């Protein structure tokens, strides 16, 4: 099915974007998958604070959702990145934030560097099963003492012959409980700067690896998040992605895709909340008339819909820059910053307009409100985005 969707026809092209009729057919396939395989079970998975990743990912892999822009040689479809962008928008239809986040880790966070810089053997062993959905993977970068300061990581991988011996801890790792392998950023040479780090594939069945604990979160409950421990974990040097000491650079490169799809998903999710709120305000009557007839309410909803459209178009602009083969770090950082702030405002206003009903867990607004808070923290906090943008604009003070 996935191959059939990847036609190159330009009929039905959306002006100003890279979307074609083929992308629309792909969207419809994703919507059916969400309606049949995810949304009917979301409430139960949220209550359990975990979802069956191997089962869901296998079904997603059968549709080709994890290999859209990856080579056919490794099970991908070799499509343009607009398919990934379409997927990010459609996943906002999932009735929670955790499952789209978990899927995004698989497609846009844990595997891009492996695809670009990994050896053929490494791709066959780890990338191919991830694309098929036969393996769940995770990106293990963040540490408790570092957060967004990636250059400060302390987890180390010491060379011992043809192996690395890994020691350290990772924190707030999405898919960490269920992952079959990790894309780990570790320090392979001593120091405290970004130099000397490497990306290494670590199978989670390796002796010495353990999940210290599954973490409880404010939102995104269905997605498991874990603290990971590496106690003399031995993996072959052949598991290193690319050159030794280049891991930080590789990681920074794949952050841009992560930030772009996060911003696109936020725009689609914010629009979903606003449309839900509009329908609620049309049906809810106070003081003898529908809420939607209050000027403050329909003006505010209109303003936020405009802001969402601006964000969406900024993301599409990133796609056009990518099509030209140019760097879009500045624009992706702007989109990510705007997305985190806007989705929080939308969630807050929409909950307010729902009144007491919005505060009840039995109604989805409470979940969306909780889930929305993460975007200004994960994938680079707002403050990190501001720092990046300031450097591009030439207004950051010299270090």
Go through the PLM ranges and name each one:
Residues 154-156:
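Short, surface-exposed charged micro-motifs
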Residues 111-117, 139, 151, 191:
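Flexible, glycine-rich active-site loops centered on histidine and acidic residues
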Residues 162-163, 167-211:
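A short core secondary-structure module
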Residues 1-97, 104-105, 117-122, 129-134, ...:
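Alpha-helical interface subdomain recognition
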Residues 103-104, 130, 145-148, 172-175, ...:
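Short Gly/Pro-enriched turn/cap motifs at secondary-structure boundaries
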Residues 152, 205-236:
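Flexible, small-/acidic-enriched active-site or ligand-binding loops
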Residues 79-80, 149-151, 175-180, 193-196, ...:
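Short glycine/proline-enriched turns and hinge-like loops at secondary-structure junctions
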Residues 133-141, 185:
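A short, Trp-centered hydrophobic/proline-enriched beta-strand micro-motif
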């Amino acid at each position: 099915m996935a191959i059939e969707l990847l036609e190159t026809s330009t009929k039905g092209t959306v002006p100003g974007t890279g979307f074609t009729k083929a992308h629309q057919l792909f969207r419809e396939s994703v919507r059916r998958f969400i309606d049949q395989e995810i949304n009917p079970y979301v409430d139960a998975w949220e209550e359990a604070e975990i979802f069956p990743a191997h089962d869901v990912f296998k079904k997603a892999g059968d549709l080709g959702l994890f290999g859209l822009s990856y080579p056919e040689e490794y099970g991908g479809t070799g499509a343009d990145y607009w398919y990934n962008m379409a997927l990010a928008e459609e996943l906002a239809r999932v009735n929670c934030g955790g499952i789209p986040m978990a899927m995004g880790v698989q497609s846009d966070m844990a595997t891009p560097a492996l695809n670009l810089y990994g050896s053929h053997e490494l791709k066959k062993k780890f990338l191919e099963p991830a694309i098929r959905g036969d393996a769940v993977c995770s990106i293990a970068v963040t540490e408790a003492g570092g957060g967004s300061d990636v250059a400060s990581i302390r987890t180390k991988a010491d060379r011992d012959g043809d192996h690395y011996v890994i020691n350290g801890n990772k924190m707030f790792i999405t898919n960490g409980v269920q992952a079959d392998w990790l894309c780990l950023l570790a320090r392979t040479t001593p120091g405290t700067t970004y130099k000397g780090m490497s990306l290494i594939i670590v199978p989670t069945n390796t002796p010495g690896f353990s999940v210290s604990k599954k973490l409880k979160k404010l939102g995104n409950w269905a997605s498991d998040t874990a603290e990971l421990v590496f106690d003399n974990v031995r993996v072959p040097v052949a598991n290193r992605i690319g050159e030794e000491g280049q891991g930080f650079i590789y990681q920074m490169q794949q952050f841009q895709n992560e930030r772009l799809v996060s911003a696109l998903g936020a725009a689609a999710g914010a629009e979903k909340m606003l449309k839900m709120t509009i329908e609620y305000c049309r049906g809810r009557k106070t003081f003898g008339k529908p809420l939607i007839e209050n000027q403050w309410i329909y003006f505010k909803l209109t303003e936020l819909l405009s802001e969402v459209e601006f964000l969406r178009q900024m993301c599409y602009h990133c796609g056009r820059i990518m099509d030209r083969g140019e760097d879009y770090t500045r624009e992706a950082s702007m989109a990510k910053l705007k997305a985190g702030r806007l989705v929080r405002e939308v969630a807050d206003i929409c909950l307010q307009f729902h009144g007491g009903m919005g505060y009840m867990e039995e109604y989805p607004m409470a979940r969306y409100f909780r889930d929305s808070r993460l975007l200004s923290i994960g994938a680079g906090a707002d403050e990190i985005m501001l720092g990046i943008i300031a450097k591009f604009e030439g207004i950051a003070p010299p270090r």
